[in-house]
């Protein structure tokens, strides 16, 4: 019985007969007559492993290896007499060996490699998720959380006054202490929340939704002016903008889990946000840093290895320009619609005055009713102007700011790449310095040079990982942003078309009701 392989004779190294074969086939197989002086270090050692495995394998395992032989018939049970038995083990013995005592693992490995194509067996170690799968994962992100901002309230007098908003949250998520709660927040609190989130997440490639822009003129009117229609209109615009901003924050899976967001929604009192004023020291420092980043961005020329990022960045820049042009046109439309409403109101007053001075009763009544129709139409124009603003102009304004944040994510990826390249250049200089020390035979400084090389090798590896991670995050964030943008535009455009349809239907209804009065004029 062959248990090792070092003391086996030539006859023992021959493959054993399969069950069901006649003795003649065994004799035919033994006709090779190898020399007795063969050593175990020669090429025939490959049959040693095969012979031992075959003696200790069950017929089921041996049969599973036979389909490799292209000349076998009936699953390898009936062999042709003139075929050499070595062909049966030509492929199987390549994967089997007795170097390890864990023969069961070798058998499983052999069966796996035989059943899979070579390329598939190599690539089956760690499957990488595709970005289509990442997009499907984003579709599963559904959060049962709704925030609302209501009741803007002016607190204080003069230039020290501020406006507080009621932030109401409804949710069934276990992250929060209750299902419904409300807190009071001022505008600087919203700005402070953005600063905290941006500081933590923007450097990692996340798209942090921006808050609405400051309006120094609008807030000055609210602080020192009386409560008129312009102040109420400004507060309503800001309230709606803050609500959209906060809803985008809680819709983001990463932002929702941030403790600063939960604190903003739940905590009764927040510490005063500092550095949010435009003319403060922190505000001026931010403006200076933005200018510095813009200059450094112009000096960085990135060798893009992934064409996807280059194409997406061009799409984002072109889309931002188009949205700016469209936003300017929509703002003009809003102003014209408001002007039309004012002119319609003046027209209605003039018709009413003319109707009251008319002697013809039928004509006087018709003019008076026409004035009433024009007053109703003036209300329609005013409502439609508001719809133009809140459903179109504000949507475009939000996405102009969001696209700027998307560009910032690409810029952050570029900075990470530049840091990686700078580290590689520094590592190359350290290696050159080590080579000069070796050439100059200065062993006292050589160890320090080696330590610096090890340190920079570690930095290069870490920076490369950072670049790969931020590339993955930016790609995933852009895919999510495009989905949210499509859904957002669809909802707003549908609502806008519904308002236009309602306005036209009401307009036709008013004129149809007035037509009999016009025909009744004698």
From Swiss-Prot:
Annotated ranges, domain PX: 143-272
Topology class, membrane: Peripheral membrane protein
Family annotation (InterPro entries): AH/BAR_dom_sf, PX_dom, PX_dom_sf, PX_SNX1, SNX1_BAR, Sorting_nexin_N, Vps5_C
Compositionally biased tracts (Polar residues): 55-73
Residues with PTM N6-acetyllysine: 237
A cellular component annotation (GO) from this entry: vesicle
Segments of skewed composition (Acidic residues): 35-45, 132-142
Domain notes: The BAR domain is able to sense membrane curvature upon dimerization. Membrane remodeling seems to implicate insertion of a N-terminal amphipathic helix (AH) in the membrane.
The protein's assembly and partners: Predominantly forms heterodimers with BAR domain-containing sorting nexins SNX5, SNX6 and SNX32; can self-associate to form homodimers. The heterodimers are proposed to self-assemble into helical arrays on the membrane to stabilize and expand local membrane curvature underlying endosomal tubule formation.
The protein, known as: Sorting nexin-1
């Amino acid at each position: 019985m062959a248990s090792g392989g070092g003391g086996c004779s030539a006859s023992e190294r021959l493959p054993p007969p399969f069950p069901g074969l006649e003795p003649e086939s065994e004799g035919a197989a033994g006709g090779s007559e190898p020399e007795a002086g063969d050593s175990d270090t020669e090429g025939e050692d490959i049959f040693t492993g095969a012979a031992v495995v075959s003696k200790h394998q069950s017929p089921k395992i041996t049969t599973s290896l036979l389909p490799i032989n292209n000349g076998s018939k009936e699953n390898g049970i009936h062999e042709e007499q003139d075929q050499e038995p070595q062909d049966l083990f030509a492929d199987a013995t390549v994967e089997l060996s007795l170097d390890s005592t864990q023969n069961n693992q070798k058998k499983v490995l052999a069966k796996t490699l035989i059943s899979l194509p070579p390329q598939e067996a190599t690539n089956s170690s760690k499957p990488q998720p595709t970005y289509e799968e990442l997009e499907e994962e984003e579709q599963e992100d559904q959060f049962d959380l709704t925030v609302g901002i209501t009741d803007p309230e002016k607190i204080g007098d003069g230039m020290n006054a501020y406006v507080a908003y009621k932030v109401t949250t409804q949710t069934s998520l276990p992250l929060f202490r209750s299902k419904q709660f409300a807190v009071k927040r001022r505008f600087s609190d919203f700005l402070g929340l953005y600063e905290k989130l941006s500081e933590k997440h923007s450097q990692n490639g996340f798209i942090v939704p921006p808050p609405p822009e400051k309006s120094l003129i609008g807030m000055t009117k609210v602080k020192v002016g009386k409560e008129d229609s312009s102040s109420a209109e400004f507060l309503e615009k800001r309230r709606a903008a803050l609500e959209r901003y906060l809803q985008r924050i809680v819709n983001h899976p990463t932002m929702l889990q941030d403790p600063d967001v939960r604190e903003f929604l739940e905590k009764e009192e927040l510490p005063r946000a500092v550095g949010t004023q435009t003319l403060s020291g922190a505000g001026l420092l931010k403006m200076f840093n933005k200018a510095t980043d813009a200059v450094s961005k112009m000096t960085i020329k990135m060798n893009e290895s992934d064409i996807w990022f280059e194409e997406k960045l061009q799409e984002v820049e072109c889309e931002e320009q188009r949205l700016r042009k469209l936003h300017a046109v929509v703002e003009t439309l809003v102003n014209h619609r408001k002007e039309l409403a004012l002119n319609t109101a003046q027209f209605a007053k003039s018709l009413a005055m003319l109707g009251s001075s008319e002697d013809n009763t039928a004509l006087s009544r018709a003019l008076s009713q026409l004035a009433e129709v024009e007053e109703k139409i003036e209300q329609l124009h005013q409502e439609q102007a508001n719809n133009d603003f809140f459903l179109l102009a504000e949507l475009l304004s939000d996405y102009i700011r969001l696209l700027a944040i998307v560009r910032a994510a690409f810029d952050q990826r570029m900075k990470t790449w530049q840091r990686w390249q700078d580290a590689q250049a520094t590592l190359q200089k350290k290696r050159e310095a080590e080579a000069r020390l070796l050439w100059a035979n200065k062993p006292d400084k050589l160890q320090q040079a080696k330590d610096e090389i090890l340190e920079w090798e570690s930095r290069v590896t870490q920076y490369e990982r950072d670049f790969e991670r931020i590339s993955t995050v930016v790609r995933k964030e852009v895919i999510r942003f495009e989905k949210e943008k499509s859904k957002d535009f669809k909802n707003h455009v549908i609502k806008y078309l519904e308002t236009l349809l309602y306005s036209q239907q009401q307009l036709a209804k008013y004129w149809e009701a007035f037509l009999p009065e016009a025909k009744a004029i004698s």
